């Protein structure tokens, strides 16, 4: 899932995918609005100083496809959330320049320090349109309680 040995492309959509996506498109504005509500709530209510959240320029409107935070130790945070029945994920734990598929380009660890830092510290919080208010509140409460005792 996270490790790529070769560069690949797949531009084909199968008929079933097209049918599902065609039906789903009518819900996109509603889903986007809900994702934005949840994302803005996270931004406002998660106040733990160990958690850094992405900030967006005022002239932009984020959709919150993912809600990515950075923490000092992403494995510890993911474990903590899992112990409290909240699933979080790492996204792209290996930066592109260190993937086997790009080994021929000669990049080494340290060549892209920002990408490497983010790969080691990013966590994606749950955020999906169907989240209930109690689930959202639980994520917020757990984030705020993380390593604060």
How would you name each of these model-derived features?
Residues 1-149:
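PLP-dependent aminotransferase class I/II
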């Amino acid at each position: 899932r996270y490790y790529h040995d070769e560069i690949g492309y797949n531009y084909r959509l199968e008929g079933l995918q097209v049918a599902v996506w065609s039906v789903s498109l009518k819900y996109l504005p509603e889903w986007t609005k809900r994702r934005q509500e949840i994302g803005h709530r996270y931004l406002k209510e998660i106040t733990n100083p160990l958690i850094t959240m992405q900030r967006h320029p005022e002239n932009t409107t984020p959709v919150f496809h993912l809600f990515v935070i950075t923490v000092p130790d992403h494995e510890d945070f993911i474990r903590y959330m899992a112990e409290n029945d909240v699933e979080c994920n790492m996204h792209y734990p290996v930066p592109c320049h260190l993937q086997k598929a790009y080994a021929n380009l000669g990049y080494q660890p340290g060549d892209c320090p920002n990408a490497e830092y983010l790969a080691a510290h990013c966590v994606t919080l749950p955020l999906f349109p169907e989240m209930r208010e109690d689930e959202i509140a639980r994520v917020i409460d757990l984030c705020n309680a993380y390593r604060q005792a």
